[in-house]
UniProtKB/Swiss-Prot annotation:
SUPFAM superfamilies xref list: Glutathione synthetase ATP-binding domain-like (SSF56059), PreATP-grasp domain (SSF52440)
Designated name of the protein: Uncharacterized protein y4sG
Function, in words: Could be involved in the biosynthesis of a cell wall component.
Keyword terms: Cell wall biogenesis/degradation, Ligase, Plasmid
Domain of life where this protein originates: Bacteria
Family of the protein in this entry: Belongs to the D-alanine--D-alanine ligase family.
Annotated ranges, domain ATP-grasp: 123-323
Keyword Cell wall biogenesis/degradation annotated: yes
GO BP term (any one): cell wall organization
GO molecular function, one term: metal ion binding
Length: 336
């Protein structure tokens, strides 16, 4: 089958530079290497692949690679890794283009990506579904009332991913500066939520009508300087927080975490695969921090570690995601 792997490794394919750009993370940025790994995995299963940019030329590129079939049969699919170039709700841009063009693709719809992109909406949906999530407030000045919040608090952009801008604030006097940094650097509101001191657990999910919960991953933060998984802690620190998979969690709590994670997946309208990030407080009470509708697929990521612990190879995971998406569209899988 023809599979186009779409990512954003260059940020030049636009008509104008307009709107908030995707934050440029500290280098090296792994996106291009991940796309190459996905291409190789798809080729292992015999797929004809094309690696292309999720920019203004995408539909022209796809039409050449997978031209319309005269009998209206599917001419190919997209494995979507595109996180967007600029503007609002960037994760929705490529899926929206593909919806309009009639090209099937892996991962969440524009709706699903939009709901998870907006942390306020996703946390509200969680609460409405009975999923516990830390108390929070939205701020633009840092002088708003904090009467409903317990310090320390975590301050982060309302819409960004990859732990961009994540800050831990211990005292109300520090809050204004932290909020100002978010508003100035990222041109959006700051989400201020209560910090949950305890274990950090990531839960990888695969599927749709039936969702497979992969073995849980725990980040061992006890000996690590940073109490938060910031971008720097995850990707640039000399010693990164070690991960344990499967996490050592007693049976009753593990069942609760699985149920909470699937409920979050469904509340936020995710598809095919996602990752739910939780904290367990010192009493063992779980809180969902957020859900990632396009979790990282690098060979060192928590999602891939969970899949490999479940018995997948990297290739079988990538082709399994494609198979799940194909089954969602057409009622049958590719893998048989």
């Amino acid at each position: 089958m023809r599979i186009a792997v779409v990512c954003n490794s260059a940020f030049t394919g636009v008509i104008n530079r307009f709107g908030q750009p995707y934050p440029q993370p500290p280098q090296p940025w792994p996106q291009g290497r991940i796309a190459d790994s996905v291409v190789a995995a798809l080729q292992e299963c015999g797929h004809e692949t094309l690696l292309c940019e999720g920019d203004k030329g995408l539909l022209t590129t796809l039409e050449r690679f997978m031209p319309p079939d005269p009998l209206a049969r599917t001419s190919g699919m997209v494995f979507n890794l595109a996180e967007g170039i600029q503007g609002e709700y960037r994760f929705t841009h490529v899926p929206a283009m593909l919806e309009m063009a009639g090209v099937p693709y892996t991962g969440s719809s524009p709706l699903g990506h939009g709901l998870t992109d907006d942390k306020v909406i996703s946390k509200t949906l969680m609460r409405d579904s009975g999923v516990p999530t830390p108390n929070f407030s939205i701020m633009r000045r840092g002088t708003e009332s904090t009467d409903d919040l317990r310090f320390p608090v975590v301050v982060k952009p309302r819409h960004e991913d990859n732990s961009f801008g994540l800050q831990l604030v211990h005292e109300p006097a520090q809050l204004q500066q932290a909020v100002k940094m978010i508003v100035t650097k990222y041109a959006q509101d700051a989400l201020v939520e209560e910090y949950i001191d305890g274990r950090e657990i990531h839960v990888a999910l695969l599927g749709n009508q039936e969702v497979e919960v992969l073995p849980m991953v725990e980040f061992e933060l006890g000996e690590h300087e940073a109490p938060l998984l910031t971008w720097e802690a995850k990707y640039l620190a000399a010693v990164q927080p070690p991960k344990t998979c499967p996490a050592k969690i007693e049976s009753k709590l593990a069942t609760l975490l699985r149920d909470i994670s699937v409920a979050t997946f469904r509340a936020c309208q995710c598809r095919d695969y996602a990752r739910v990030d939780l904290r367990l407080d010192r009493s063992g009470q779980p809180f969902v921090l957020e859900i990632n509708s396009m979790p990282g697929l690098s060979t060192h990521s928590a999602y891939v570690l969970a899949a490999m612990t479940a018995g997948h190879s990297y290739s079988s995971l990538i082709n399994g995601i494609l198979d799940v998406a194909h089954r969602r569209y057409f009622g049958n899988g590719i893998l048989g």
